[in-house]
């Protein structure tokens, strides 16, 4: 199997997951999105992103829009709980980018895990706290927990998920 892992990472979270995934995919190339090759000619195209306002970040989104006629698996990191409604919405948004009918892709699955939030984004959220994202005790606790991720367990779960996605290609 010829696999391609492309990732966009702001804090290193998504890169860490990308490296874990690449380690279990035979015949795998791994590239940051800035230097990623065109997605054509691969049996599996895995694209990783950090969640920005409920969507894949701009660089990952631009790359995803180039993927056509491919078997695709997505992965991402976000500050929210990975089993939250927000996370499910983020997964749907990412898959919608790939599933546009004119692109003729097949999404094999998505893996999303929690990751530390860039301190600049946390500071920005605190400035606009009263408007959109108030810094409640729950939000503060979630951000503190997110700072511990991705951890080894997150990497192992990503590897297991992608072994399963790869089996769909073989």
Residue ranges and their predicted role:
Residues 24-31, 44-47, 52-170:
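FMN-binding flavodoxin-like domain, especially the glycine-rich phosphate-binding loop
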Residues 40-42:
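Alpha-helix C-terminal capping/helix-to-coil transition sites in glycosyltransferase folds
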